Each structure stands twice: as structure tokens, then as C-alpha cells.
Amino acid sequence: LVKTSLVLTQHLTTLRKNIAIVLQDVFLFSDTVFNNITLGDPSISLAQVIQAAKEVGAHDFISALPDQYHHKIGERGGTLSTGQRQLLAFIRAYVYQPALLILDEATSSVDTESELLIQRATEKLTAGRTSIVIAHRLSTIRKADRIIVMEKGTIIEQGTHEELLALGGHYKNLSDRQYFNQEA
């Protein structure tokens, strides 16, 4: 039993190091920006965090904070906007370089400016790795290799963005509505 627990623990540790999740509601500690990104991992340097922030497009907003990367943020990131909290979560995922990335509604409640930064960050972060992106905003998933459209837990369509538009089904209807809303 002890050996099984040890093996399971080792496997879980490896698994956890290879998966990063960016949720709709980002959890942040009442700590510095740096510590919220590294989660206290001493193997991640400030230089790595700064480089990741530049890649994600968040370096400018962090540099504008009073103590920059050492700025202490309030409980749950209360002193930051929703978009800024999302960007910190993207930097966190970026510095860990996971094999599997899961994005759950990462752009659902952010302003337009933050959404553009997050879309660029998504492109950089998903490049070269397996990614599962859960999104209602189709702009987030347009470049995906494969899009799965679900309704009430059932797959109803799948394909690339272009294939799904050509299909003329549910995805096309969603796309048309979102495009129309952007134009209005």
C-alpha cells in the first residue's frame, strides 16, 4: 500500500507539472505579482517571469504597478481588473510550459482591450502543445486545429473553423450572431 501510494504520488506530481489550467475566475493570493505567477516555485526566476509577461503582453501593465513584479496585490487580486487577473494566469501557465493546457472561458468577462491581449496570449501559449479551450467567444478558437461544438453535453459538430462555417449548422449560426453583434 505504501509503495502504491508513493508511485501514485510521484505520478500525480509529474501530471500536475505537465498540466496548466487558466480558469474564468482566476484565483490569486494576497501576495506579490511574482509569487502569484510562480506559486512559490524557486526554480522560476524573475527574468523568466518578465520574459513570459512580455510574450503574453502583460509586461506594460505590471511595470506600471507601484512595485512592478514585487507589487502586493489584494486578496483574490481585488486591486486588478478582470483582464489583468486573466493575464497573470496566462503568465503563470507560460512559465510552467505545460504539455497540456486547459483554458476555460478565459475571455468571458474581460474588456475588449484585454480580450485582444488574451487572444494573442492564447495563440502563443497553445502553439506546439495539446490544448483544450472551452469558449463561447468564437474568436478565441478560430485558429484551432479541431473545434468540437457541444450542446447539452453532446457533440453536435466538429471540424476546423472553415469546415464548420461551410457546414452551415450550429457553429455557423453562432458565428453569424457574434459577428453581427460585433458590427452593431
Show where each model-derived region lies.
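ABC-type ATPase nucleotide-binding domains, specifically the catalytic core motifs of the NBD
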Residues: T38-L46
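ABC ATPase nucleotide-binding domains
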Residues: D176-A184
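A structural signal for short, well-ordered beta-strand elements
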Residues: L8, L46, E157-Q158
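ABC-family ATPase nucleotide-binding domain "signature/switch" substructure
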Residues: R16-D25, V33-N36, A52-A58, Q68-G168, ...
